[in-house]
Structures are given as structure tokens and as C-alpha cells.
């Protein structure tokens, strides 16, 4: 009888404890508890699984104009290759660096131009003066894309702790789970550019700038283990420069033209889907700043395919084209 009373008393005590927690009487969770809860919203990842199934793509780029170039034709590529639901968003500031992104995050600054295109209507829309938090939570983004500024990408001393700070902010601020995070490895400027940093930092040497971009990624991005994929945009572009395309893939000696954007777009698509490019089905391409459509010949498509596939296989070095200058 005494044992029965003790058991009943114990059960009543446990019930009281659970009631207290449910009514808010529990202590405030620690920071580690909060972090663990936030991380729990992220799905368990298979490192070998594709980030995109080829049908649905929802990607947000936090970027500069070079990220705009990389993603400008991604929508067109995805739709041409059979996707049915596509949303591409970009939070963009011209020349934006990692340091600037972190400052904007800390100040919740309405500093970005936000552009977005959706398969719902296939039209780019632009909103000015948007914050990182607003863009991150505008859609249930599956993939977050970011990079260093173009002039700083090949300068490891500009990275600081900004990558970690930015990624921490993104994960704490975004309210929906993310399938993957991707880092864009940028291309070198055209050999004859007059951009000051190209000459003062990289000695006016395209291959040196390309190699320094890769070195910075190896030293400052790979060891962090914060990104599910690295996008070898720079290697794909450099591969294509060894073909009969030559050093003609920019519109102004540093921003990509429409042909360069096709190469970058297919590189990103291949990385996200995990698929080798076996066809280049995109039609005539144009952009908001380059409205004259470019029609790819059959041989052009082979060069695009070759440049991308070789970059995926060998992202850290240039693979000479089988279609050299004629």
C-alpha cells in the first residue's frame, strides 16, 4: 500500500513538472539549445545527392554583378533542360564584397536590389531597397548561392572571418530549410582589360588572376566545410577561352556577355543537378543589358558542353579545348 502511494506521488510530481514547462515556467533555452533547434530545421544531407532534381529549382544569390552574370540565364537554361518550376532570385549590390554583406546583415540594411524570375510568368521583376532578411524569407529557397567580390576573389587576405559570419547569419535568419549552399568561383578578367586591380594586384596576367581565384577558394572556402558545392564558373570560362571562342566572353573586359553567361549558367545547372551536360538546348539568348539575341551554332553548343563538363571533372585546372582557333 505504501509503495502504491509512493508511485502515485511520483506520477503527480512528474505531471506537475510537465505542466510547468507547458505553461512557460521552464527556464529560457541556452544559446546552444537555440542553435541546435535552428540546425534541426536543416534536412539531413547526403553529400552525394544532387541539390536539384532537374524539375524544381528555387535558388537565391547573395551577390555582386558577377553573380548576376552567373545566374542571368540560369532560368532559361533550366527551362530549356526540362525544369517545370523555377524561381531564381538575386540580392545584388554592384561590387559587393563579403565584408559589405556582413555589414548589411548586422545593420539590417535595406541596401539591395532584389530581382526575381519565376516560371509562373517568366518575367524578371525588380524591387529596390531590400534587406538580406527580406530576400531570404521571400520564398522557400532550396539553394543559397554566394561569392566574394570580383576584385577581391583572388586576394585571400580580403576574406577574414566574413564567410563564417555571413553563413551563420543566413542560417539563423532563413525560416525554411535549405537543401544546399553553393560558392561561386569566379573567372579572370579579359587579358586586355584596363581595370586597375587587374594590373596592380595580378600583374596584368589573366592566368595568374585565374590561379589566384582558385588559391583563395582552396585556402579560405574549402577548409570551412560550409558549402555543399563549389561552382567552377571561372574554370569553365577559362576552358572556353582555349577554344575558337578565344578571349571574347565578356561585354566590357570583365562582365560576361551572353555567350559567357550561357557557359556560366550551364556550369551552375550541372553542379546543381549533378548531371553531365549532354545537350545544350537553350534557344537564342539575350539579357536585360545585352538585348541583341545570340544564336548558338551546333559547334558553339559543343564548345559550351565541353567547357562545362571539363570544368566539372577538373575544376582546379584548365582543360584545353578540342575546338581550337580556326
Can you say where each PLM-predicted feature lies in the sequence?
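Bacterial N-terminal signal peptides
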Residues: 11-19
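Alpha-helical cap/lid subdomain in secreted, periplasmic
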Residues: 129-254, 258
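Conserved SGNH/GDSL esterase-like catalytic core that processes O-acyl groups on lipids
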Residues: 69-159
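Sec-dependent signal peptide cleavage junction
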Residues: 18-39
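Bacterial N-terminal signal peptides that target proteins for export
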Residues: 1-11
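N-terminal module-boundary/linker segments of secreted carbohydrate-active enzymes
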Residues: 42-82, 304, 314-316, 320-325
Amino acid at each position: 500500500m505504501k509503495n502504491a502511494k509512493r508511485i502515485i506521488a511520483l506520477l503527480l510530481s512528474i505531471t506537475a513538472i510537465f505542466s510547468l514547462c507547458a505553461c512557460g515556467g521552464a527556464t529560457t533555452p541556452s544559446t546552444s539549445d537555440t542553435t541546435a533547434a535552428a540546425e534541426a530545421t536543416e534536412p539531413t544531407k547526403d553529400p552525394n545527392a544532387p541539390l536539384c532534381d532537374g524539375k524544381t529549382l528555387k535558388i537565391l544569390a547573395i551577390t555582386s554583378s558577377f553573380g548576376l552574370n552567373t545566374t542571368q540565364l540560369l532560368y532559361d537554361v533550366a527551362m530549356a533542360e526540362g525544369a517545370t518550376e523555377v524561381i531564381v532570385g538575386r540580392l545584388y549590390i554592384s561590387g559587393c564584397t563579403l565584408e559589405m554583406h556582413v555589414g548589411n546583415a548586422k545593420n539590417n540594411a535595406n541596401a539591395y536590389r532584389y530581382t526575381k524570375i519565376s516560371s509562373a510568368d517568366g518575367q524578371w521583376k525588380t524591387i529596390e531597397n531590400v534587406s538580406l532578411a527580406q530576400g531570404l524569407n521571400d520564398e522557400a529557397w532550396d539553394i543559397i548561392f554566394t561569392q566574394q567580390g570580383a576584385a577581391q576573389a583572388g586576394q585571400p587576405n580580403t576574406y577574414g572571418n566574413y564567410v563564417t559570419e555571413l553563413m551563420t547569419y543566413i542560417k539563423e535568419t532563413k525560416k525554411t530549410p535549405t537543401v544546399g549552399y553553393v560558392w561561386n568561383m569566379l573567372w579572370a578578367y579579359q587579358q586586355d582589360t584596363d581595370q586597375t586591380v587587374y594590373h596592380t594586384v595580378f600583374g596584368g596576367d589573366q592566368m595568374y588572376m585565374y590561379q589566384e581565384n582558385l588559391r583563395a577558394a582552396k585556402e579560405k572556402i574549402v577548409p570551412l566545410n560550409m558549402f555543399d558545392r563549389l561552382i567552377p564558373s571561372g574554370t569553365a570560362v577559362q576552358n572556353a577561352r582555349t577554344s575558337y571562342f578565344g578571349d571574347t566572353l565578356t561585354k566590357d573586359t570583365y562582365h560576361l556577355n551572353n555567350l559567357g553567361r550561357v557557359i556560366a549558367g550551364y556550369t551552375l545547372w550541372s553542379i546543381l543537378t549533378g548531371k553531365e551536360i549532354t545537350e545544350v538546348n537553350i534557344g537564342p539568348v539575350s539579357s536585360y543589358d545585352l538585348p541583341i539575341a545570340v544564336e548558338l551554332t551546333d559547334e558553339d553548343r559543343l564548345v559550351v558542353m565541353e567547357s562545362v563538363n571539363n570544368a566539372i571533372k577538373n575544376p582546379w585546372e584548365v582543360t584545353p579545348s578540342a575546338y581550337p582557333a580556326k
